[in-house]
C-alpha cells in the first residue's frame, strides 16, 4: 500500500469533519499485513471540550424531540446498517484483523442493539398509581440526563459503540465518542450513516485520541455519564476519576473466563465450543475462553481432541476464504503474547500446542497460532492475567467443586461455562460460581441486546450494566409527580 492511499482521519463534531488542533498522529495498521492504512489524530483537551460544548448545546433541543421521532431516525439508521453490512464487515476485518465471518457477526450484533434502541417509546414509559391516598395519585416519568461520553475498544469497533450511543440518543441524550485509535475508520463510517439517517448535528460526535481525550471526558462538568469498555487497569481508572467528578460511570473491564468440562460432557461439542471461544477473534474479546477446568477422568481425551481440532485451524488474512484465526491487533501485542508463552513454559505448564511454530506466525502481520497449555495451576501468570490472545490454559480437577473453586479464585468474573448432561451439576454451578454471564454447553455466553452484559468483580465497575433495561436506566433519570385533585 502506497503512502498516497493512507487515509487522514478527522474528528466529527457538530455534523462537520474537523481537523484536530494537534499535530500529533498515530499510524493505523492492517494487522494482517503490517501496512499503514490511515493516520489518526491524537486530539487535544481543547478538541474534546469543543465537542462537549457542541453536544451540550444540541441536548437543549434534542431532548425535546418526541421519543417516537427519535426512534424513527434509528429505524432509518438500522436500515442503512443492513444495506451496508458487507462494507462494514470488510472494514472491521481490515483494521481489526478478525475473520470476515466474525466481522459479519459483529455487524449483526450491532444492528440488533440499534433495533433494541428503537423500542425507546415503550421502554421509556413511566409508571402510575391512581390512588396513593385520598384524592392523591403518583406517576414516574423518565428523562435523559445530558451529554454522554463513550470510550470504546479496538476488539469490537462496531458492536460495543452500538451498545452505547443508540440507546443514549434514543432516550434523548447527546453523545461524544472516543473510539480506539487502532480502529478509527469503522467509527467514522458509523457517524456518516447516522448523518444520512437524519440525526441532527451535534447529537453524535467523535473525537479521536488517547489520554487527553479520555481525561477531557472524565473531567468536564457538562458530561453527565461515562460508558467505557476496555482493559481492567483503564476501567478502574475511568471509574475512579469519573465518579470523583460526580458522574455516572459504567466501566466494563477485563476477564479470565473459565469453562468447566465434566466427565459426562459431550466432548465433541465441548471441544468445538471451547475452540471457537478461545481462538475466535484471536482471543481478543472479554468473553473469550481463557481457562478450561476439565475433570481428570476425561482430561487426556479432551486435550487430544482439542489439539487435533486446533491443528486444523487456518491462519491468515481474515478476508481470505476459509481463514478462522486472524492476527492480533499490533506487533507489540504479539510480542506480549510471546512473553506469556515463555512464562508458561518457565513456570512448568505443559505446552501442548505452540502457536509460535505455525507458518503464519513467521510471516508479515501480527500472527500467533492457537496455543494450548496443559497442567496449568493458579500460581502461574498465564492463569492469573488476561492475555487477550489465542492462548488457552487447561487445568485438571477432580470434580465440579474443584472447578468452581478454581474459577472463583480469579479476580475477574465476566463469564463462565459448564459442559455436562447433568441438571443437578448445572444448578450447583449456577448457584456457586462467581460470574455474571453463564453458559451451559456453549462457549461464549454473551447476552443479546435486551439482556445486561453483567460482569462481576474486577470485570465491571459500576451499578448499571450495558444493554437491556440496565442500559436504559443508566441513560435516564426519573421524576415522580404526586398530584392532588381538588
Swiss-Prot record:
The active site is at 286 (nucleophile). It catalyses: 3-oxopropanoate + NAD(+) + CoA + H2O = hydrogencarbonate + acetyl-CoA + NADH + H(+); 2-methyl-3-oxopropanoate + NAD(+) + CoA + H2O = propanoyl-CoA + hydrogencarbonate + NADH + H(+). The lineage of its organism: Bacteria, Bacillati, Bacillota, Bacilli, Bacillales. Disulfide bonds: none annotated. Catalyzes the oxidation of malonate semialdehyde (MSA) and methylmalonate semialdehyde (MMSA) into acetyl-CoA and propanoyl-CoA, respectively. Is involved in a myo-inositol catabolic pathway. Bicarbonate, and not CO2, is the end-product of the enzymatic reaction. This is Malonate-semialdehyde dehydrogenase 2. One of its GO terms (molecular function) is methylmalonate-semialdehyde dehydrogenase (acylating, NAD) activity. Its EC number is 1.2.1.27. Homotetramer. The gene is iolA2. Belongs to the aldehyde dehydrogenase family. IolA subfamily. One of its GO terms (biological process) is thymine catabolic process. NAD(+) binds at residues 154, 178, 181-182, 231, 386.
Amino acid at each position: 500500500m502506497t503512502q498516497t492511499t493512507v487515509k487522514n482521519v478527522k474528528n466529527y463534531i457538530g455534523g462537520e469533519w474537523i481537523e484536530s488542533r494537534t499535530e500529533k498522529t498515530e499510524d493505523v495498521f492492517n494487522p494482517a499485513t503490517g501496512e499503514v492504512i490511515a493516520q489518526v489524530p491524537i486530539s487535544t483537551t481543547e478538541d474534546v471540550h469543543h465537542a462537549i460544548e457542541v453536544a451540550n448545546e444540541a441536548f437543549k433541543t434534542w431532548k425535546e424531540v418526541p421519543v417516537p421521532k427519535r426512534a424513527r431516525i434509528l429505524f432509518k439508521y438500522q436500515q442503512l446498517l443492513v444495506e451496508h453490512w458487507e462494507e462494514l464487515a470488510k472494514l472491521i476485518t481490515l483494521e481489526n484483523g478478525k475473520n470476515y465471518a466474525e466481522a459479519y457477526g459483529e455487524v449483526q450484533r450491532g444492528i440488533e442493539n440499534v433495533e433494541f434502541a428503537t423500542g425507546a417509546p415503550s421502554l421509556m414509559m413511566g409508571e402510575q398509581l391512581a390512588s396513593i391516598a385520598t384524592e392523591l395519585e403518583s406517576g414516574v416519568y423518565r428523562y435523559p440526563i445530558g451529554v454522554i461520553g463513550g470510550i470504546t475498544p479496538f476488539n469490537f469497533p462496531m458492536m460495543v459503540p452500538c451498545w452505547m450511543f443508540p440507546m443514549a440518543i434514543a432516550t434523548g441524550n447527546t453523545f461524544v465518542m472516543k473510539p480506539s485509535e487502532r480502529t478509527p475508520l469503522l467509527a467514522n463510517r458509523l457517524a456518516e450513516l447516522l448523518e444520512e439517517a437524519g440525526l441532527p448535528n451535534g447529537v453524535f460526535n467523535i473525537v479521536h485520541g488517547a489520554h487527553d481525550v479520555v481525561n477531557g471526558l472524565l473531567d468536564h462538568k457538562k458530561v453527565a455519564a461515562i460508558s467505557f469498555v476496555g482493559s481492567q487497569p483503564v476501567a478502574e481508572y475511568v471509574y475512579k476519576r469519573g465518579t470523583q467528578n460526580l458522574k455516572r460511570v459504567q466501566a466494563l473491564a477485563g476477564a479470565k473466563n473459565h469453562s468447566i468440562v465434566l466427565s459426562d460432557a459431550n466432548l465433541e461439542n465441548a471441544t468445538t465450543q471451547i475452540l471457537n471461544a478461545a481462538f475466535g477473534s484471536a482471543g481478543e474479546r472479554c468473553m473469550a475462553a481463557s481457562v478450561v477446568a476439565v475433570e481428570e477422568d476425561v482430561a487426556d481425551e479432551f486435550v487430544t481432541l482439542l489439539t487435533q481440532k486446533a491443528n486444523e485451524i487456518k491462519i491468515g488474512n481474515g478476508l481470505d476464504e476459509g481463514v478462522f484465526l486472524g492476527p492480533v491487533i499490533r506487533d507489540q501485542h504479539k510480542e506480549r503474547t510471546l512473553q506469556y508463552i515463555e512464562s508458561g513454559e518457565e513456570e512448568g505448564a505443559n505446552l501442548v500446542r505452540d502457536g509460535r511454530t505455525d507458518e503464519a506466525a513467521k510471516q508479515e502481520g501480527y500472527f500467533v497460532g492457537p496455543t494450548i497449555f496443559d497442567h496449568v495451576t493458579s500460581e502461574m501468570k498465564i492463569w492469573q492475567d488476561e492475555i487477550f490472545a489465542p492462548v488457552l490454559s487447561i487445568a485438571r480437577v477432580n470434580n465440579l467443586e474443584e472447578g468452581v473453586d478454581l474459577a472463583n479464585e480469579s479476580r475477574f468474573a465476566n463469564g463462565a461455562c459448564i459442559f455436562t448432561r447433568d441438571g443437578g451439576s448445572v444448578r450447583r454451578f449456577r448457584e456457586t460460581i462467581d460470574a455474571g454471564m453463564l453458559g451451559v454447553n456453549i462457549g461464549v455466553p454473551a447476552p443479546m441486546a435486551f439482556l445486561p452484559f453483567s460482569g462481576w468483580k474486577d470485570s465491571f465497575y459500576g451499578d448499571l450494566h450495558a444493554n437491556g433495561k440496565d442500559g436504559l436506566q443508566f441513560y435516564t433519570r426519573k421524576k415522580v409527580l404526586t398530584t392532588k385533585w381538588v
